[in-house]
From Swiss-Prot:
Binds predominantly GDP, and also GTP. Acts as a dynein adapter protein that activates dynein-mediated transport and dynein-dynactin motility on microtubules. Residues 376-386, 719-740 have a biased composition (Polar residues). Residues 101-110 have a biased composition (Acidic residues). NCBIfam families: small_GTP. This is Ras and EF-hand domain-containing protein. It is found in: Cytoplasm, Perinuclear region. InterPro entries: EF-hand-dom_pair, EF_Hand_1_Ca_BS, EF_hand_dom, P-loop_NTPase, Rab, Small_GTP-bd, Small_GTPase. One of its GO terms (cellular component) is perinuclear region of cytoplasm. It comes from the Eukaryota. Ca(2+) 1 binds at residues 21, 23, 25, 27, 29, 32, 61. Residues 82-110, 376-403, 713-740 are annotated as: Disordered. It comes from Homo sapiens (Human).
Amino acid sequence: MEADGDGEELARLRSVFAACDANRSGRLEREEFRALCTELRVRPADAEAVFQRLDADRDGAITFQEFARGFLGSLRGGRRRDWGPLDPAPAVSEAGPETHDSEEDEGDEDAAAALATSCGPASPGRAWQDFQARLGDEAKFIPREEQVSTLYQNINLVEPRLIQPYEHVIKNFIREIRLQSTEMENLAIAVKRAQDKAAMQLSELEEEMDQRIQAAEHKTRKDEKRKAEEALSDLRRQYETEVGDLQVTIKKLRKLEEQSKRVSQKEDVAALKKQIYDLSMENQKVKKDLLEAQTNIAFLQSELDALKSDYADQSLNTERDLEIIRAYTEDRNSLERQIEILQTANRKLHDSNDGLRSALENSYSKFNRSLHINNISPGNTISRSSPKFIGHSPQPLGYDRSSRSSYVDEDCDSLALCDPLQRTNCEVDSLPESCFDSGLSTLRDPNEYDSEVEYKHQRGFQRSHGVQESFGGDASDTDVPDIRDEETFGLEDVASVLDWKPQGSVSEGSIVSSSRKPISALSPQTDLVDDNAKSFSSQKAYKIVLAGDAAVGKSSFLMRLCKNEFRENISATLGVDFQMKTLIVDGERTVLQLWDTAGQERFRSIAKSYFRKADGVLLLYDVTCEKSFLNIREWVDMIEDAAHETVPIMLVGNKADIRDTAATEGQKCVPGHFGEKLAMTYGALFCETSAKDGSNIVEAVLHLAREVKKRTDKDDSRSITNLTGTNSKKSPQMKNCCNG
């Protein structure tokens, strides 16, 4: 049995030795052994000790006999291993340095055992090669192949059951890498195509510019050549004329000479002298003319040289213009790319806005269907709480829950708002009531809103105001009650709303609770009814923009003003939000368009565009955040840069109710006199408010609206929206703006 066991051990050792002998030389060199131990995470000192123990003949290589003798001795256990005649086993009874040798022997044995276990019959190197062969050409996509192969061999040695999952992981990685490489190639091809297209466009532009330059150069040369030829032809004609005159003079002189020969000298001496004098004078005149002609020729030559220099300068300027045009082309391409990015972002925002709008309309339609299923008309359902109207009594419109006698009165007021035509006049006359919009932020320009207002005028008259009116009708993007045409409603509709009574009893479960609080500075109801009759004919909407850093409470301020509500966790404004509010300013009914801008840095450019046509600005800061107060100067500079004229500004210190609490907690707060000084510096109004308890909200808006009305009365050319009804027409400039 012992012999059979030794035979099996020798067979295993032979397979292990064959796996370690990579070059099939029958000998393990020192470098091969070190590389094998490095892959197996064996310390270099232990690897050297194991090699020295196995290398019995000290020839620098291990044969199979030495390998088998050393490992058989370690596998048989104990301290009785036969290490050969050159290295006898150490004595157990001795102390001192021999104990240290014994510890080294144990370390060598552990390293040898690890080597024997790792290089078992399974042959991890061969398994890795087989796996690579199965992969085929995909093996070249393996990143860091050496580390992957080492981990593969270690897993094969420690836990062979994990080999198959590991192979699946490697295949998945290879598949992903191939996909990534394919995508990178496609991207490279697309980039190359774009570059080629840009190069073609640039080359076409260069060719066009070259053609234009050549045409201009040819035209200039042709003109200069024509002018030079004309000048030379003039000079040639003058020269020929003068030569002809000289020839005629010479002929005359010859004739006179012949005549003088024929006549006697005594008779003609005086005449000849006179003729000679005349001819000499004429000769001098001709010489003078010749000199002038030569001077003109020199002057024309200098002009020709100047034209040549001008032509050279124009050529240089043309080259410079070409360089500038190339730079402009590059800038234009960059701007086009930026515009495409902005258009993509704008489309995404519009898509999200449409999705939110459709979700809101679906929710309202589901609510209406549930009402029809339960045989409950929308007219008997409370949509939202509103201030109480009591006929034509002269009591004030104050919103006080303690003054209500029962839930039935509150339900009656709420049910009166279900009729869209009656609800419009009701909401306009009540100061603390909200002017609803979609509730969604929008990035549209105010001019687009004017076009939709005209469309809403036409559509609002066609809606029935009976029981069939659904809540989805007021959930459109710009279906704001205050924008509807109020002139067609008349005072009779106002009276009908004030005299409206419920058709049936309303349960307590239908009453909607809210966090609304009473707002001060309200006018009596009778005054509002009288103001309705005066303001139907001429009603203007003033554009008020809310600005300030993020999280200063602009949306809460607007919600408290329009809806008389306060919500703790309100979402941040994306882009711009819009509300309408009607106030009584100096006894006149005034409609305000309130634009809530986002305070984040990425929306600053959008907010800046709304300052251009703003009639007034509510500039908010947080009294518990000093940074928002320090940024007020930057906001004021932005408003002054965007607005063409001086815009009234109301500086509002919000969150005044929590300033003392924040100060006790150690936060750096902004005192009230700091805000007053800053407002005096810029000539602005100042007020501290609290959107949570509603203090000074309406007062701040009233003061700003009063200042806006004063400014607009002095300057009628301000950009305001005329809401006088269907009889009023838009100005040509507004039509061109909306229809362009």
